[in-house]
Amino acid sequence: MENWGLAEWLHWQETLNPKEIDLSLNRIRNVASRLEILPPENLTFLIGGTNGKGTTLALIEDILIQKGLKVGGYTSPHLNNYNERICVNKKPVDDSRLIESFKLVESVRKDIPLTYFEFGTLAAFITLNDLNCEAWLIEVGLGGRLDATNIISPSISIITNIALDHQEWLGSTLEEIAKEKAGIISAKIPCIFGDPSLPKNIEQTALEKGSDLYVLGRDFSLSGYWGRLVWQGKDAAINSIRIPSHWAEGEIDDLCLALMAIEIVDSELLPTTKELNHLLNNFSVSGRFEIIEKKQTWILDVAHNPHAAENLRKRLESLDPYKKITAILSLMQDKDIIGFVKVLDDLVAHWIVCEMDTPRSHSVQTLQKKLIDYGISNVTSASGLLEAFSNVKNHTKKNDRILITGSFEIVGPAKKWLDSE
């Protein structure tokens, strides 16, 4: 163990707990109590919700870095390298730094069977602590109430939105899911919610915990016309905001959330109009409507539920509407295949389904049968991801548009493959 590399550590962590997901805070709190983890008192952001967490986090990250702060971020899952999960000023930490944190967790863990995610979460907190990050941006993994990230005391809790996803863990209705997501609301700590449709369980939890609750559309908003938008927060406003042309409502909501969170924790950190427009002009998040221009135009998006597919559709519609799309799709077994596909189908000329390199992936046979049974005839299959990518490359023309979507587990390999081409 002393001489293990990162890959060996990660493989071993997968064997510690027989369950891949084992929602409970008892184990991680027990181990955390033996470590010195001290998040910044005024700049610790805990970001939950169904969709938009990564984009909201990235916007806050860019704004705080622009203001000269040392910003630590913890996100999951990763696209290709585990190190992507733990970044300081957007730069992934190196293997040796991660391994030192793993060793420290293991030295105090004793016989407590931490899950892979719990072990990594503790290592992330140790790393951000040891590197003296002035702000912590923490993305919730699954749900909220029992998620490993929920052991920290945030300065603000952010819930982006509530949609159907992970129903086997979080509940089958929006209110049940909202109750789990609301678990990140801390007593007397402000919370912001990024959807005008406020679930009763979020409102009730905030009330019970004495937390000030700020709701998009009620307490803060972005309004006006394109190129001259105005963000209005609690007491502050930013005028003449230029939103990127390919953004849809989801990204606009994420920006509203990011700005509101910053105003609440420290309004002095809000950007000027010039600073914000410069930031937005250069803003991107890997795997979120990421456009890679080769011979063809490749669009990579990690959307994996119907709510995310709706936003993806709006972004696709912002492009040339006369160009039909070839879509490469794979989804995990717990995802709603038809709910996802029917949102995008009329934009797609040809579907190619394939299986990801994980036992949680839907089989290619299941994906193809579901699409055909739904009435989609323009669907073919590939035996694996690389076959799907290369077949599409070889059978499409210059400037054709190719969408790869459905999971981090297909977008990551696609990005790696495209980088090597």
Stretch-by-stretch model annotation:
Residues 1-51, 55-70, 79-80, 96, ...:
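N-terminal leader/targeting and accessory segments in enzymes
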Residues 5, 19, 25, 29-40, ...:
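ATP-dependent carboxylate-amine ligase catalytic core
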Residues 43, 130-131, 135-140, 147-158, ...:
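Nucleotide phosphate-binding/pyrophosphate-handling subdomain across enzymes
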Residues 60, 145-155, 415-418:
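Short Gly/Thr/Asp-enriched flexible loops that form oxyanion-binding sites at enzyme active sites
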Residues 77, 192-195, 207-224, 245-249, ...:
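Beta-strand->loop->alpha-helix junctions that form or flank phosphate-binding loops
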Residues 144-146, 153-211, 337:
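Conserved catalytic-core segment of NTP-binding enzymes
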Residues 192, 196-201, 208-213, 225, ...:
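C-terminal helical cap/extension that packs against the catalytic core
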Residues 407:
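Active-site-proximal loop/hinge segments that shape catalytic or ion-binding/gating pockets
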